């Protein structure tokens, strides 16, 4: 999991992510690599507090030293992989290229549209209304921008079982979008390709936001409450 950066001095934010620090994998691993030095400070502070609270000051220092040696803030392998990958290295399907290329051979701006499971569960019909509106706007502007819609891979399994009525409507939207063929629908396992290929990110808040920002892509998080306008 890639977390948004948290200020080690922000007690409320640290409290909200403590459960990531205390999972068995962190306790049992020989080495733990986290995404930044700030994140390392948080892990060290949390784990020292959790494991040394009833110890003497001298013992607390030893325990802190143990966590400082164990936790490495050198970065996320996921981020590193995305940063190393160039557009020229990508294998882009021909059907995608047909959407991306303009008649003169130049490329349209590619917008990575990411939709999440949590937004659908939380907002239900509002998300469907938002989806229809987003697809309408990109359909109308398809000569200049190519939409690369990549829903979270667990949407089908989760929504179909928990909200079957919502799933039926959602599935109709997906089928219509794919049949019309003016945009890209990415249901592959390769999320890195979408991040590297795109010119900007739009959609729900997720761990992919940080990856896109690290890659230097502009990011806009959608507001499901705003519908019927070309801008948010």
Regions found by a protein language model. Give the residues of each.
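Conserved acidic residues
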Residues: 30, 109, 196-199
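Hydrophobic/aromatic beta-strand patches that form the interior of the parallel beta-sheet core
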Residues: 31-33, 72, 148, 200-202, ...
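A donor-sugar binding/catalytic signature common to diverse glycosyltransferases
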Residues: 1, 186-230
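Structural alpha-helical scaffold elements that stabilize or flank donor/cofactor-binding regions
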Residues: 25, 104, 193-194
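Active-site and donor-binding regions of nucleotide-sugar-utilizing enzymes
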Residues: 1-83
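Short, solvent-exposed loop/turn segments at secondary-structure junctions
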Residues: 1-3, 38-40, 77-79, 116-120, ...
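Conserved catalytic-core segment of nucleotide-activated headgroup transferases in glycan assembly
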Residues: 61, 76-170
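Nucleotide-activated donor-binding/catalytic signature segment of Leloir-type glycosyltransferases, i.e.
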Residues: 163-187
